[in-house]
């Protein structure tokens, strides 16, 4: 590899690292909402999986404890899936054109 090509590659890697850091900061600000029980349980979290809010409809508080636990778990799982999808979508624009194997997840 020529010296100029190596320098160009290093510069490109540094730029990508800076862009990745900016994207991580943006993802920490993006909130997604997971729901279960037709919206009776809602979980709001960032794309960095920091939970911001859990909302439980008062009608569920008198119901079966097991049902409530299942709905909370389902809402969390829904929020995590949405956060992952949003992260992949945002990161996809940064990694387009890179020869990454299928299913490879960024950030590392």
UniProtKB/Swiss-Prot annotation:
Instruction: Write down what this protein is called.
Output: Nucleoid-associated protein Rmet_2128
> Which residue intervals are annotated with compositional bias (Pro residues) in the record?
99-108
Cite the record's note on assembly. Homodimer.
Compartments, as annotated in UniProt: Cytoplasm, Nucleoid
SUPFAM superfamilies linked to this entry = YbaB-like
Family membership, please give it. Belongs to the YbaB/EbfC family.
Compositional bias per record (Polar residues), positions renumbered to this chain: 86-96
Q: Could you state one GO cellular component term attached to this entry?
A: cytosol
Mind listing the GO molecular function terms for this protein? DNA binding
Q: Which Gene3D superfamilies match?
A: Nucleoid-associated protein YbaB-like domain
Function recorded in the entry: Binds to DNA and alters its conformation. May be involved in regulation of gene expression, nucleoid organization and DNA protection.
Question: Which residues does the annotated region (Disordered) include?
Answer: 86-108
Q: What is its main location?
A: cytoplasm
A Pfam family matched by this chain, by name?
A: YbaB_DNA_bd
Q: Does the keyword Cytoplasm apply?
A: yes
Alphabetized, the UniProt keywords read: Cytoplasm, DNA-binding
């Amino acid at each position: 590899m020529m010296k100029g090509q190596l320098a160009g590659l290093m510069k490109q890697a540094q730029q990508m690292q800076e862009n990745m850091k900016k994207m991580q900061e943006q993802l920490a600000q993006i909130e997604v909402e997971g729901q279960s029980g037709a919206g009776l349980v809602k979980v709001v979290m960032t794309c960095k999986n920091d939970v911001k809010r859990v909302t439980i409809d008062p009608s569920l508080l008198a119901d079966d404890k097991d049902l409530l636990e299942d709905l909370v778990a389902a809402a969390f799982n829904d929020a995590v899936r949405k956060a992952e999808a949003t992260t992949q979508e945002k990161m996809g624009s940064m990694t387009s054109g890179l020869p990454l194997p299928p299913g490879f997840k960024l950030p590392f």
